């Protein structure tokens, strides 16, 4: 993680009711970033429910139920049998969405970066740490634009 992204995320800690909405707005952006990598229909349904929640006037605290459901699905993910690591992107994307829906932006950002890099092939994730930089920059820009921190 870049120092800039780390600094931005630290502004959303500790988790409070006052920063719940910005944490969840960034979380939704994280979900949408990796949504194309998701495999499990129930996780995809959770993302849609999360999107609906964020667009409605419902109590945002309902996100915890979605987060718990997505976490259970992530923990039960069968993983990947592919040798190139691309299949691991679905696992990381599922964990990214679970963290995002649970209001944990730092963990969501970390999993988003892994999912996007794994989605390009496993080599970069294990052998080229710089392959994460474009994703970290994207996350920085999204966090700044969505929640106005920085």
Regions found by a protein language model. Give the residues of each.
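Structured binding/interaction patches within domain cores
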Residues: 1-150
């Amino acid at each position: 993680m870049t120092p800039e992204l780390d600094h931005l995320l630290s502004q959303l800690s500790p988790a409070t009711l006052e920063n719940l909405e910005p944490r969840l707005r960034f979380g939704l952006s994280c979900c949408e970033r990796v949504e194309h990598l998701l495999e499990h229909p129930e996780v995809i349904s959770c993302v849609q429910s999360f999107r609906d929640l964020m667009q409605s006037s419902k109590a945002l605290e309902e996100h915890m139920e979605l987060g718990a459901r997505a976490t259970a699905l992530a923990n039960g993910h069968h993983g990947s049998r592919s040798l190139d690591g691309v299949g691991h992107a679905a696992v990381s994307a599922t964990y990214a969405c679970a963290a995002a829906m649970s209001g944990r932006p730092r963990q969501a950002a970390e999993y988003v970066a892994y999912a996007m890099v794994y989605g390009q092939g496993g080599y970069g994730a294990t052998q080229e740490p710089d392959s994460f930089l474009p994703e970290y920059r994207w996350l920085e820009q999204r966090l700044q634009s969505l929640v106005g921190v920085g």
